[in-house]
Amino acid sequence: MGGKHQGSGAGASSGGGSLNSSLCNSVMTNATTASSSLTQQQQQLQAKYIKSKRHQSRYTSLQHSGHDSGSYLHLNSLWSIWYGVMLTLFQGYLAMHGAYRFLGCSLIPWKIEPVAELNLQIVLSGVVFILLPVFFTSAVFKVGNLANDGIKLATGARERRCTLSPHDGLEEESRGGTLRALWTHGGPTAAFVHIVIALCLLLPRLLLEARIIENGLLPKEQIWATELDFVVINRRNLMAMSVVGATPFPRHHQPSNQQQSHHQHGRLNLTANSLEQDEEDYFNDTMFTAIRGVPAGGNNNLFDLRPDRMANGRKAAKTTATTRTTTTANKLDAGKGQYFEVPDLINQDIDEEERQELEEAIRGEEDDGDEGVGVGEEGTVIMPDFDELAPRTAVGTSTTTAKASSDADKLNVENWQQLGTLGKADASSSSSSTTSTTTTTTTSTTTTAATTTSTRGTSTTTTTTTIKPMEITTSRQSAHHHHGKSRKHHKHHNKQRQQQPPRRHHVASHEQAILESFPEEETTTRDSSIHRVRPEVLPELPIPSTPVSASNSKIIAIKAKNQKRRISKRAAGVEIEPEYLLGDANINSSEFVAKSNEEEPEESEDFELEDGDFQAVPALTPAPPAEPNGPKSGQDYVRLDGFAGMLQLFFGIDKPIDVAIFSQPPSAEFVNLLCALLVWSVRYPAVFWNTSKAFACVFSLQMVVAALDIILGYVGISNLYKLQIYAEAMPVHQPGLILNAVVTLALYLLSTALVLASSMVMYLYGHGRLATRMRDRSIITLKTHQTWIYFAHCASLCFVLALAVVKAPLLNDLSATYKNNLHCPTFLAALVGVTHLLLWIVIWLCLTIKRRWHFKLPPLDSTYGGLLGKSSAQPLLMSSGQRTGSNSSSSGCNSTSTTVNGGDSKPDMMSTATSTELGMGMGMGIGGGINGGMGGTGMGLAAQEDIYWPKLTPSSPKLKVTFNEVTSTSDDVLLIGDQEQTDGKRHTSRGASVCFASATGEVDDGEYATLRAATAGAVVGITMGSMKRGLSNTSVGVSLLHLSEYDELPPPPPANLHHQQQQQQQQQQRQAHSFAHGHPHDYANLSGLGGISDDNISEEGKLLACVRDDSITYASTSDLEPPQPSAQAPPPPPPLPIKGAPVPQPPAVMPHSAGIYGRAPQAMPEMMQLSPEHHHNPLQHSLQHPQHHPLQQQQQKQQTPQHPLQQQGNPHQHLVSPLAPVTVAVHTNEAHIASSSTPRCLRRADSGVPNEALTPRSDTTSTTESTNTTSPPERAPSESSSGVHSGEERELEVIIRPRANSKPPPRPPQPPIQEEPYGRCTNMRMSSFNADPAATSSAVINSATLPPQRSVPEQKFDYTAHCSTMPLPVGCHSQQLAGSGNGYASTSAMTSSMGGGGMPPLPPSQVSSFMTPNSMHYANASVALGNVSGQQQPHTTLPNGVRYSNPHFLRRLPHVTKAAESPYGHLGYGAGHHAFAKLPHETHPTIPEDRDSANYSMASDQDCGLYVTAQLH
């Protein structure tokens, strides 16, 4: 379980950012929630240092597993629990019974002790006891197997809340190796173990039953007993009846019939003698003779399951015409009542002696033969009268050839072959021979047909079957006494039979040889009263077919009294199965003939031979004989030694087992197997029931047929096995059998294993199709090679070939057996085996033709949040809608993630890897720590989902804020992020307007500056710094984290501060910073994302301190800090990665900048959403949602380019902290401002972005900070440091570049950032700030998807005027805005907003106007963006055509707040943002001049999406 959970957890972590890890996410669903409880700092740190996605996933899964409930045992479904309990008890009982069977069989006196079978019985019983705990555990508890745990594929989160739910591999490849995959996707564990236990219980029973039959403890007919006899009527038993009819036969038969009936009645009375005789008859019947008369042994037919006594006539499944040459009627005394006389057409011409001999032989043959036919010496065959009222069947009379033996042989063989023919006219003779079809089964109650052969006018009838040869001998002697003259014949017959049995033991070749010698022996047989009728013919025919050969070999007139001898003879010569024993019968007859011909052994000899035969053929003894044997063998109490003796003492067993239990179908073991296969065939296909009932039904149908194949295969194989074991003792002529007992059993077990494995092939097909559908509908996933889709087809082909090879020999033996005995279960076994193969081929042909299946799939949110088990493993996707403001991303995960991936041309891969590392690291760490306060779970998830930030432009590790003409690293990053978000590709054009590839900082850099707060080191520094600082530090990490925290946790404790001036804002920032650990976490993520992106993408992340013509780069994040802490703000944070600088600066700048910065991402949405100073909570919530969304996008972008940094930064600020510093940098990028929501970015706005932009950046400090931001760019740098969470952000450099051309401040000071929830178009990137036409063009490219409307309002704002540090000619901004299609302006705005207001501050007046109405509410560029957005309708043209009005969407598409006044008024708001194609998320009317482009740019495009959505909400 633990391993499974780990695997799924690993999948979840890696799938945290990916929609592909449905199982992982599902496993992580609760785990993620619980993980938020973990110390976020630890999580962040651990996530940072986890370099491998798999390792991070494992770590996350371990955390989740620990937090899931602390319990590794999860109960299965109720019905499964009861199934486990009941079947465990039942199988425990069967195992105990197996031990009892072992002891009971050990006490039986065996002629040939089955040591191997007994040992196997006790060993397998022990194995069952070992497997029972496994079965119970897997049935009652969840073990990570989909089918066993009752998990339905492609279901919602509610189905998959259990953390132990394995990874289903639908959304993404499952973790783990082949063994884990087999464990997860294999058949139901409990049912599989159940099947194994059932086979372990069933096989020993079969082995012992075969040995018992071999030893004669059970009648040979038991060979044909099956587990399905309670359902299927044995056809052979019906065949005799159908053939038998009233036989008006010669007077001879009637008297002899009377005598026979008398004898039979005596036998029926089951006197001791009669029993013995019956046993003898039974043995004779078991001889290989084709014709099994119903002589004394009654059970001559192997097919007849009934004991000889009880089913004398039934035994002949196939009735063979027996030829009787005896014409004397009075010799057929026996069988009058029970046997019908059939004219012996074959023997009519034979002399009475010959006839008598033939009759005796026939009787022996009859005993041996399937038919219980008594043949009168007169030439009539006496058929056992099953009903006794049934008329005797009249057989056409035909003259028998002079050679009764050869003719009789032929006739018998022919009759056996004919199985349905009553008579055969062999010669024209008055004597009649009765031919009964071997197909007929006699059901007469008499065990043996007693026929009287009167050679001298005396007729004797023997109707006894002897269990033991000795007993048989006795009975024979008595019979001989009764018979008088017939004794002689009987002796010969017995002798012959005895001789024959040895030959029986011989192989068919021996039998044939014997048959060949028959003619010579036949003569002797005639003398010995065995007619030569069968000798020659039988050798020929016997091989092919029937017990007739036996009758032919010794067409022993079945004398009622001599029957005993006859039976004994037959016992020696009769084959167990007439059907198989055709050849054997011939052999027997030849043997008997030879012996009888050569020497007419005395009865004693015959008895001895018979005894030998019986010993050789123990199975021949009917059940009744077995009883006598049983007492003999078990009379003495045997004390066992060793382990058996210990068990004997334990169970107190001192008596041998009653072998009768083996003949009572069905056995409990067989029922247990039925139950196991039923559960298997239903529960395995059930995994597809919710998603595709049609496929589940097809799957189940195939499995039901497979189960039938296993069940009926066992029935057929059991018959084969018993027959082969018996043949070892009593050689049976087996014309078609090519296997021995061991190989037969081994092949059956192998075929069973293949059939069970075949179900996995069908499952593989269905799972592959479903996984393809699940992944195809997720834009995030790339459709790659589908070559494996045909793997299932190849596997099915291999299965068919393997199963055909294994089953071919078995089917051959089954068909050969059925051909001889017409055994219905044998036929069904072969038929179902072939049908299964054909059905498999047909099903797979259909599956190959059917290209598409209709699968019912859950909603994407449900899939990712529920199936993934993490309720949206991606914070952006899930947080804004589900938990934090970034849930907009969560809900829009598919669309947003899709857009991001589609636009960024990065599928889940980046989100998975980045989100897994950053999301898991930051989400789990930051989410745990930061979100611990505000909703750690949401953030934790958000952190994972941050990967889906549209801003997947981490390709540029540098975050640049460039003004219109200037292409800066920050711009590259931002552009990359924006373009990824917008176009699905990263544009590294430095001239491009604002690149807020990094979530907050980078984007916030906007056109002017990008705080490079999110390099790996910077992120780590931020995280560390934020942790040092306290709540905000912990969650966000240094300065960036503070801003991002505020973004994530928009409402700092003092909501008024947001409305208030810088001090209030600073306080809020501090509070927000403190909140950062908790609520700001989401914003921290956003900022962090920005920072990370910035670090990865922009030079500004490096804290470049240089001013380009059109861009200003602040070496320290302090430059971008909101001016509120003047001291803090002025000190430009060194271009250190966020790690170093942010920590120092956060204290001073943190309070202010944290509030501002944190609010910047949140502030704008906050203002848009909540104009009240309560924006902290609402902003936190709303901004968290939107912020999270953009942050996630940014994180994705950031993570992709600089995965390590992102991981580190993300863990701290939940992917936002890195961005936060960046956000500080850019005012121009309102989107950056919004995304970063970093007040520092607002200060950076000093460098060129209106203060208002800064104000929106910071929630509380927005107004004051705007004013401060209005302060010289130095403040902006200071703000960069502190506003960007200098402590965190110092690592993040803010490059404030005018980007006059590329990012003219599309948002001139937007002092009145209208409180429009959508007002802050953080998506709007102030790409117009980029001075470089190239940047502009790239920005335009980014905004290609966006409607030109953003570029339409090209509000030229002299960013330079607003940001002294980032002076940028208005013309440049306009140019860039125009050149970039106003995409840069919007991009800058977004980046600025994302950056957290790091854009150059707007003029104080602008700031105050903007900040007062909006910054108070929004306290950051998001407000400005919102206003701009308000002015300009949000672009609905996202890369995926989705409109981002829902905060749940992560669309990081640069929300160009449509030419809303960009911080650079000359460019116009739209110009600043139009570059972001993804901006359509929502175009918030932006106040062209009300908010500075710095605010816009400060909101990263990603953040913009979040903030805008938040504002919209």
Swiss-Prot record:
Protein name: Protein tincar
Residue spans of biased composition, Basic residues class: 478-507
Region Disordered, annotated ranges: 247-266, 354-373, 383-532, 879-913, 1045-1090, 1115-1155, 1173-1214, 1231-1335
Cytoplasmic side: 1-77, 142-181, 690-696, 758-787, 848-1513
GO BP: any one term: cell differentiation
Function: Involved in eye morphogenesis. May be essential for the normal differentiation of ommatidial cells.
Spans traversing the lipid bilayer: 78-98, 121-141, 182-202, 669-689, 697-717, 737-757, 788-808, 827-847
Record's compositionally biased regions (Pro residues): 1122-1149, 1303-1314
Organism in which the protein naturally occurs: Drosophila melanogaster (Fruit fly)
Membrane topology, Extracellular segments: 99-120, 203-668, 718-736, 809-826
